[in-house]
Amino acid sequence: MAISKDDILEAVGNLTVLELNDLVKAFEEKFGVSAAAMAAPAAGGAAGGAAAEEQTEFTVILADFGANKVGVIKAVREITGLGLKEAKDLVDAAPKPLKEGVSKADAEAAKKKLEEAGAKAEIK
């Protein structure tokens, strides 16, 4: 019997966050792809109507790691759950999106934690 799409969705839905992280890494290794979110193309004329609505999803951007690189790496690990190497690579690549599609409260908390560690962060 073949596994259906619904069976896969049900199985993935029952995984913990750590198990999902391991699954994503396994997909990246097996298929040679990256799970990094791609930038969406800019919308043309429809952007005017959407601007009137209140923004509900925010992106936290690590603009600069400042003088305390080690502290910023620790903060990035806490915020994202990344491993040490991945967090260091992300900090080294600043400016870089750290979290995407999060609520305003989560974005503010992440920005505060980064700034307390000595980094410069932005919310878009």
Swiss-Prot record:
Key word Magnesium present: no
Subunit comment: Homodimer. Part of the ribosomal stalk of the 50S ribosomal subunit. Forms a multimeric L10(L12)X complex, where L10 forms an elongated spine to which 2 to 4 L12 dimers bind in a sequential fashion. Binds GTP-bound translation factors.
Organism: Herminiimonas arsenicoxydans
Keywords: Ribonucleoprotein, Ribosomal protein
Organism phylogeny: Bacteria, Pseudomonadati, Pseudomonadota, Betaproteobacteria, Burkholderiales
The protein's name in its UniProt record: Large ribosomal subunit protein bL12
Protein family per UniProt: Belongs to the bacterial ribosomal protein bL12 family.
InterPro entries: Ribosomal_bL12, Ribosomal_bL12_C, Ribosomal_bL12_C/ClpS-like, Ribosomal_bL12_oligo, Ribosomal_bL12_oligo_N_sf
HAMAP family according to UniProt: Ribosomal_bL12
Record's GO cellular component terms: cytosolic large ribosomal subunit
Function in brief: Forms part of the ribosomal stalk which helps the ribosome interact with GTP-bound translation factors. Is thus essential for accurate translation.
Pfam families membership: Ribosomal_L12 (PF00542), Ribosomal_L12_N (PF16320)
MF (Gene Ontology): mRNA binding; structural constituent of ribosome
Entry's Gene Ontology BP terms: translation
